[in-house]
C-alpha cells in the first residue's frame, strides 16, 4: 500500500464500518486509499487530474474526473467519505453538488486535518446533515451524519468574476486568487512587451488570467492553457469565451497530456498540493520545459523569492535571469540554447 495521509489513516481506524457499504470517495484525495479500500463497492469523484490519474488504472470507470459529479456515478452509493480541502468555499461547492445527488438517508463521513478547517463542516452542512465528531487522531477530525435533506445545486449560482487589465475573469470556488489578480501574477505580466507572436503555453492556468491578458496585448499569439483542477479548466474556458479569445484548455498534470513545442511557457506555479508544501509540480515544469521549447524558446515564471528555483533552472537550462523582483516575488526567465557542438573540431 502506498503511503497514506493522516486523514486516510483515521478512516482505516473504522474500516469495519464500510465492508458492506457502497462507498463514494470525494474531496481532497491525496493518496490511493480508494483503490485498495474494502467495501461492497467503491467509486471516486476527483476534481484534480493528478489524483484521478492515480485512481483510473485500478478503478477504471468507477473513478471520474470532472467539475461536478455525474449522477450515475453517485446514484448507487449509500455512503460518502469526503476529504475536507483547505478552501472552505471549495468544500461548500463540492458538498452541495454531492448532496444534491445522494439520497436522503445516505451516510456521510467528513475527514480532514484540523489545520484545514474541517471543524467548520458541522456548520457548512447544518441544513442537510447533523454531523457528530466520532474520532480525533493524527491531528485530524472525523465527523459522521445521515443526510436528512437533499441540497439544491445549480452551477450558475457559483460563478464570480472580476475585471483586470481589460480582461473579464470568470472564477469558481477553489481557484487561486478568485477575487482578483494576485501580486505575483501582476509582476509577471509587467515583464511582457505587447505584440508578441508564436505559441504560448500557460501551465497551472487557474482562471486563465495570464493567457487572456497576454492575448489581449498580443492578438497574434496562439494559446494553450492547462491545469490539474477541473474548476480551473472550466473557469479558463469561461474566461476565454467572455473575452472573445481563442485557445485550447487541457486537463494535464504539468506536461502529461501536452503535445508539441511552444515558443514560450508561462506560469505562476503552485508550491502546495492541498495543505502540503510540494515542489514536485514545479520541478516537473522546469525540467520538462526544455523538451517543449525550441532553441530560443523561453520559460518565464513568477515565484516567491525564497523558493529554490534558480538551482532548478540552471540544472535544466544552464542559466537563468531575473526579469523583475519585489520583496516577495521574483520573475525568472530561462532560454533554451543550442547544444554544444561535438566532434573533432573544424577542418583547416
From Swiss-Prot:
InterPro entries recorded: DNA_methylase_N6_adenine_CS (IPR002052), Mtase_sm_N (IPR013675), rRNA_ssu_MeTfrase_C (IPR023543), RsmC/RlmG (IPR046977), SAM-dependent_MTases_sf (IPR029063), Small_mtfrase_dom (IPR007848)
Catalytic activity annotation: guanosine(1207) in 16S rRNA + S-adenosyl-L-methionine = N(2)-methylguanosine(1207) in 16S rRNA + S-adenosyl-L-homocysteine + H(+)
Keywords: Cytoplasm, Methyltransferase, rRNA processing, S-adenosyl-L-methionine, Transferase
Main location (coarse class): cytoplasm
Presence of the UniProt keyword Cell inner membrane in the record: no
Signal sequence residues: none
Origin: domain of life: Bacteria
Subcellular location(s) of the protein: Cytoplasm
Family assignment from sequence similarity: Belongs to the methyltransferase superfamily. RsmC family.
Protein task: Specifically methylates the guanine in position 1207 of 16S rRNA in the 30S particle.
UniProt xrefs under PANTHER family: RIBOSOMAL RNA SMALL SUBUNIT METHYLTRANSFERASE C
This protein's name: Ribosomal RNA small subunit methyltransferase C
Amino acid at each position: 500500500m502506498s503511503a497514506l495521509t493522516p486523514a486516510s489513516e483515521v478512516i482505516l481506524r473504522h474500516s469495519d464500518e464500510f465492508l458492506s457499504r457502497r462507498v463514494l470517495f470525494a474531496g481532497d484525495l491525496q493518496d490511493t486509499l480508494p483503490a485498495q479500500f474494502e467495501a461492497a463497492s467503491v467509486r471516486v469523484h476527483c476534481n484534480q487530474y493528478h489524483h484521478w490519474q492515480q485512481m483510473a488504472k485500478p478503478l477504471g470507470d468507477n473513478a471520474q474526473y470532472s467539475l461536478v459529479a455525474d449522477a450515475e456515478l453517485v446514484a448507487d452509493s449509500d455512503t460518502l467519505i469526503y476529504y475536507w480541502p483547505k478552501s472552505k468555499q471549495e468544500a461548500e461547492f463540492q458538498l452541495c453538488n454531492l448532496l444534491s445527488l445522494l439520497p436522503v438517508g445516505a451516510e456521510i463521513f467528513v475527514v480532514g486535518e484540523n489545520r484545514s478547517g474541517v471543524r467548520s463542516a458541522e456548520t457548512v452542512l447544518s441544513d442537510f446533515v447533523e454531523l457528530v465528531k466520532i474520532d480525533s487522531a493524527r491531528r485530524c477530525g472525523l465527523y459522521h451524519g445521515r443526510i436528512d435533506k437533499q441540497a439544491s445545486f445549480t452551477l450558475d449560482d457559483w460563478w464570480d468574476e472580476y475585471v483586470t487589465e481589460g480582461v473579464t475573469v470568470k472564477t469558481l470556488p477553489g481557484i487561486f486568487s478568485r477575487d482578483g489578480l494576485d501580486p505575483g501574477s501582476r509582476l509577471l505580466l509587467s515583464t511582457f512587451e505587447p505584440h508578441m507572436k508564436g505559441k504560448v503555453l500557460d501551465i497551472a492556468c487557474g482562471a486563465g488570467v495570464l493567457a487572456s491578458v497576454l492575448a489581449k496585448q498580443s492578438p497574434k499569439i496562439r494559446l494553450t492553457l492547462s491545469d490539474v483542477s477541473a474548476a480551473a479548466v472550466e473557469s479558463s474556458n469561461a474566461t476565454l469565451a467572455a473575452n472573445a479569445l481563442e485557445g485550447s484548455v487541457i486537463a494535464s498534470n504539468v506536461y502529461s497530456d501536452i503535445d508539441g513545442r511552444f515558443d514560450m511557457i508561462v506560469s505562476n506555479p503552485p508550491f502546495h498540493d492541498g495543505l502540503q508544501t510540494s515542489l514536485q509540480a514545479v520541478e516537473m515544469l522546469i525540467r520538462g520545459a526544455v523538451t517543449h521549447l525550441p532553441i530560443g524558446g523561453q520559460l518565464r515564471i513568477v515565484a516567491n523569492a525564497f523558493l529554490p528555483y534558480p538551482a532548478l533552472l540552471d540544472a535544466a537550462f544552464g542559466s537563468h535571469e531575473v526579469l523583475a523582483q519585489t520583496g516577495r516575488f521574483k520573475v525568472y526567465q530561462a532560454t533554451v540554447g543550442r547544444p554544444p557542438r561535438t566532434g573533432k573540431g573544424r577542418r583547416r
